[in-house]
């Protein structure tokens, strides 16, 4: 069994100002996305550093607003009704990937209108940069001791740990780390490799939806369902799995459509 590194959720104390690890992870996520997108822009025609900076800014707004609103609507609407101010207390945790995803989709529409880019051209460009942000987000969940995994059934399982935030003090899967590795690092490697060569329009976005859909669906089997949600469908499907199934199906259709149409709207690489 591993020992949980009980880290102070406040990373930096600056007098009355407290910088939480959760917020710091979001900052690192956006900086990493900006760096990766800037690198991709240098490899392709039609993209500038100003466009990338604006793209990340729009995306950050979509993630924060959509993620928080989505979490409230999908998971904690009753809590919001009791205390509407809680919606704005982002530093306490509570963000939904699916809400953040929808928020980014909407934000990209405004960015595309400003820069006269097609929606899928933009999504294909930024999709490989997203998984690193997911990775940092899950690390933030781990440090905060939230969204931990289900209880370990094998007493000899070497990676189980007891989270101090768990009222039952059971040995559990560190599912946040599993998700950081699968939905984050592994998906990033796959998407970065796939997008390094010319692909049909929508193909990279489709692979993101498929890859995240599969990874999230599998990881939910290790993650403890929210106490007020439990298993919603068939006695074993969680809210996260239900919300992920449409992403997977849409991704499959998009990949099929992309290779049926074979429209290549990416500019040639500058260094080729």
From Swiss-Prot:
Binding positions (a 1,2-diacyl-sn-glycero-3-phospho-(1'-sn-glycerol)): 138
Pathway recorded for this protein: Protein modification; lipoprotein biosynthesis (diacylglyceryl transfer)
GO CC annotation: plasma membrane
Localisation: Cell inner membrane
HAMAP family: Lgt
Function as written in the Swiss-Prot or TrEMBL entry: Catalyzes the transfer of the diacylglyceryl group from phosphatidylglycerol to the sulfhydryl group of the N-terminal cysteine of a prolipoprotein, the first step in the formation of mature lipoproteins.
Family: Belongs to the Lgt family.
Protein's name according to its UniProt entry: Phosphatidylglycerol--prolipoprotein diacylglyceryl transferase
Encoding gene (name): lgt
């Amino acid at each position: 069994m591993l020992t949980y590194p009980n880290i102070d959720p406040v990373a930096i104390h600056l007098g009355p100002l407290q910088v939480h690890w959760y917020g710091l992870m979001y900052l690192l996520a956006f900086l990493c996305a900006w760096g990766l997108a800037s690198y991709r822009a240098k490899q392709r025609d039609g993209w500038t550093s100003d466009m990338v900076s604006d793209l990340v800014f729009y995306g950050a707004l979509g993630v924060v607003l959509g993620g928080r609103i989505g979490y409230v609507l999908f998971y904690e609407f009753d809590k919001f009704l009791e205390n509407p101010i809680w919606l704005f207390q982002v530093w306490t945790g509570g963000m939904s990937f699916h809400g953040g995803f929808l928020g980014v989709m909407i934000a990209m529409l405004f960015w595309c209108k400003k820069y006269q880019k097609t929606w899928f051209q933009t999504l294909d460009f930024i999709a490989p940069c997203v998984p690193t942000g997911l990775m940092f987000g899950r690390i933030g969940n781990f440090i905060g001791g939230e969204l931990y995994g289900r209880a370990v059934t094998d007493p000899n399982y070497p990676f189980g740990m007891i989270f101090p935030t768990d009222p039952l003090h059971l040995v559990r899967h560190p599912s946040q780390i599993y998700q950081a590795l699968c939905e984050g690092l592994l998906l990033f490697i796959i998407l970065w490799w796939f997008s390094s060569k010319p692909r049909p329009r929508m193909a990279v976005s489709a692979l993101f939806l498929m890859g995240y859909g599969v990874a999230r669906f599998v990881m939910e089997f290790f993650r403890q369902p929210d106490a007020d949600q439990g298993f919603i469908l068939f006695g074993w499907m969680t809210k996260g799995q239900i919300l992920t199934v449409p992403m997977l199906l849409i991704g499959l259709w998009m990949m099929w459509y992309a290779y049926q149409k074979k429209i290549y709207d990416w500019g040639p690489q500058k260094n080729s």
